[in-house]
């Protein structure tokens, strides 16, 4: 179980507030890294997303723990995550539109997601309840391995640059 993860954003407070709204939770400052915020889902699992200033790197620090180092912002990258929410699809799209973020309802074959492009650079796959049910049915241990093994490279979403 993943309890929390971190992403970078150009406006961490705004991003954390929007993510918290999508989750039905709350955004709070994240003191270990000044300028960062924590979008809390406020569920029994401690689920949340730490949002750091763009360019932040987490580097090893031995037994005292990792340290935060500020570098240059990067833009697009491969990191993304799927986030189940209790918010319905229409409200997800409205929240993304109000934030000025691109948002697309996508069919992944066995399940659907709403791609919300945080600051129009980083993707979060939002799973409203009906999409979460599809996703969980697909990712059951008895199904997901066989499905991934049988998948054809022809179904890849790779785009030449």
Residue ranges and their predicted role:
Residues 26-72, 112-136:
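Conserved short beta-strand elements that form part of the metal-binding/catalytic scaffold
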Residues 51, 81-83, 93-96, 103, ...:
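Generic structural hydrophobic/aromatic packing signal, biased to beta-strands
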Residues 72-86, 127-136, 149-161:
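Short secondary-structure transition/capping segments
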Residues 2-9, 41, 62-90, 114-116:
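Vicinal oxygen chelate
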Residues 7-56, 94, 98-111, 141-143, ...:
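Core segments of cupin and vicinal oxygen chelate
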């Amino acid at each position: 179980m993943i309890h929390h993860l971190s992403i970078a954003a150009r406006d961490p407070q705004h991003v954390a507030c929007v993510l918290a709204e999508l989750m039905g939770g709350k955004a709070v400052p994240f003191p270990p890294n000044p300028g960062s915020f924590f979008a809390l889902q406020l569920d029994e699992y401690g689920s949340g997303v730490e949002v750091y200033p763009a360019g932040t790197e987490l580097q090893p620090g031995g037994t005292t723990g990792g340290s935060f180092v500020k570098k240059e912002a990067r833009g697009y990258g491969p990191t993304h995550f799927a986030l189940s929410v209790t918010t319905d699809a229409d409200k997800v799209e409205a929240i993304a539109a109000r934030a000025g973020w691109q948002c697309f309802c996508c069919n992944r074959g066995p399940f659907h997601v709403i791609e919300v492009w945080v600051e129009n650079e980083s993707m979060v796959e939002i799973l409203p309840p009906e999409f979460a049910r599809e996703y969980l049915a697909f990712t059951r241990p008895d199904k997901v391995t066989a499905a991934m093994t049988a998948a054809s490279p022809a179904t890849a979403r790779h785009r030449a640059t």
